Amino acid sequence: VNAAPERVEKLLLDGTIHIAQLHGQEDEAYIKKLKSLTDHPVMKAFSIQEKKDLDAAAASSADLILLDHGKGGTGETFDWSLLEGWTKRPYFLAGGLNPENIPEAIQRIHPWGIDLSSAVETDGKKDREKILQAVKTVRNFESSKHFLENKRVYG
């Protein structure tokens, strides 16, 4: 978090990471600098508390955006009603997601992708069984008629 762009560039170039996922106070100048240093995708996380936070996310020069609660590891979601009908750009959804609420998130607010962390951990470490259950939940929902009829294409 808040590492110098050159440090993130090094991690991308040596293959340690493949996407720069920014969760700090990185501003547009930082994102543009990092993008000038590498061809790897840059993802910026935004804490969503009100509609204006969505405007900031939509305006970001990051290749990808992640919409989050902002309080990591609490298991809390933000107010998803803020995203209902929001189609300004594809986004990853994070914050409080678990196998029980993933179907609701997909059906209700149509994220392009999901980001799971503490919900698939046991004692602070990734739990293979929890990960497999989450993947199974998404795949089961993806194969449903509702998902196929409502999948959005952005251009």
In which residue ranges do the predicted regions lie?
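Conserved anion-binding
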Residues: 2-101
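Glycine-rich phosphate-binding active-site loops on the catalytic face of alpha/beta enzymes
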Residues: 23-27, 70-77, 108-132
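Ligand-binding grooves and catalytic loops that recognize ribose/phosphate and carbohydrate rings
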Residues: 56-64, 107-111, 133-139
